[in-house]
Amino acid sequence: MNFLAHLHLATLADSSLLGNLMADFVRGNPQGSYADEIVAGIRLHRRVDSLTDSLPEVKQARQYFSDEFRRVSPITLDVLWDHYLARHWLQLVPDTPLQTFIDGAQSQIEPNLAQTPERFQNLNLYLWPERWMTRYAELPFIADVLHRMSVRRPKLAALSGSFQDIEQHYHQFEILFWQFYPRMMQLAKTQQL
């Protein structure tokens, strides 16, 4: 899961959006460094990541990647799941338009950025004004995201090439998304994540 799915599941679970969004920027035990609700959000994010990676559908999705890209497939899939969520948002969340949801999340997160890691603050300079989460619905934007990540971190250079496997197996990935994401939503709603 990437930014959009973490915010969506956090909302369903009534968890801190700030904690869930910044979790990847916090190392180690967050207890004592942040308010309890933010710590709980960070921990929810980590549980969601762990659960998602262990799902049979996600393990199956990794098998669609070529050998040269399988190592980075967990990262590629995190971004791809956000693509399907953005693309099918109104089917999954019929009561709230995507932009309304994103605006609400932004209004909860931005006033509290001063207490967050600098790298996370820098992310927020681009995430909201460039409308990343709305643009996740656009497949060319997903290619751009993967390419930018590969340039920023040379060890992840294969991310850029992994997009060809997305194109080749797009519908298979989409079927797998529909098999697991509604279950994740239900787990979040019932506080079972």
From Swiss-Prot:
One GO molecular-function entry: [acyl-carrier-protein] phosphodiesterase activity
Biological process, per Gene Ontology: fatty acid biosynthetic process
Highest taxon, organism lineage: Bacteria
Family under the similarity heading: Belongs to the AcpH family.
Enzyme superclass (EC): hydrolase
PANTHER family cross-referenced by the UniProt entry: ACYL CARRIER PROTEIN PHOSPHODIESTERASE
Transmembrane segments: none
Name recorded for this polypeptide: Acyl carrier protein phosphodiesterase
Keyword NAD: no
Record keywords: Fatty acid biosynthesis, Fatty acid metabolism, Hydrolase, Lipid biosynthesis, Lipid metabolism
Recorded catalytic activity of this chain's protein: holo-[ACP] + H2O = apo-[ACP] + (R)-4'-phosphopantetheine + H(+)
Enzyme Commission designation: 3.1.4.14
Record Pfam families: ACP_PD (PF04336)
Residue stretches in coiled coil: none
Taxonomic classification: Bacteria, Pseudomonadati, Pseudomonadota, Gammaproteobacteria, Enterobacterales
Function, as annotated: Converts holo-ACP to apo-ACP by hydrolytic cleavage of the phosphopantetheine prosthetic group from ACP.
